[in-house]
């Protein structure tokens, strides 16, 4: 695939207080031997994305330990790899990421140094299976600047998630 992958795995979920006190949400165990970030990593690996960056921040130690061996996802290639980034403390910036856009901005050099024409951004704390090749084909066919993968949410769940309003052509 002609894209790099970015997995956002730095957030703190206040609603999961007890579970997230000692580890990042993306490092939460699922079915015993998996972590929630494994789903995003597997989706990227199965879509043949060769270069993946994981932006970490909150309670990242156990997540970094889990990511320390990229052999499970086959990212250890000569032209690719698995990279982890934490907020950079400099004389000009002594803050954690101030949100998703700031995490992207603080790691802009990684994006600029990549030669792939597309970027796939995924959450590290969602459990799903997705072929990003099909998403990229759709993105190119629609000549879109940005493509967002979303699902219908109804009832009480609406307040728990970000919401999009689309027209009949699926334009946001």
Protein language model features and the residues they cover:
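Unchanged
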Residues: 1-172
């Amino acid at each position: 695939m002609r894209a790099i992958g970015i997995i956002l795995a730095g957030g703190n979920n206040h609603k999961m207080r007890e579970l997230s006190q000692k580890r990042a949400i993306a490092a939460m165990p699922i079915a015993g031997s998996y972590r929630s970030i494994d789903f995003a990593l597997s989706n990227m690996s199965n879509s043949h994305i060769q270069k993946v960056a994981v932006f970490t921040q909150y309670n990242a130690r156990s997540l970094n330990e889990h990511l320390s061996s990229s052999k499970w996802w086959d990212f250890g290639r000569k032209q690719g790899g698995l990279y982890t980034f934490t907020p950079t403390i400099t004389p000009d910036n002594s803050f954690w990421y101030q949100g998703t856009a700031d995490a992207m901005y603080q790691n802009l050099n990684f994006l600029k140094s990549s030669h792939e024409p597309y970027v796939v951004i995924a959450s590290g704390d969602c459990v799903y299976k997705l072929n990003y090749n099909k998403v990229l084909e759709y993105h190119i066919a629609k000549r879109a600047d940005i493509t967002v993968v979303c699902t219908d949410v109804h009832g009480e769940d609406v307040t728990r998630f970000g919401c999009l309003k689309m027209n009949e052509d699926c334009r946001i």
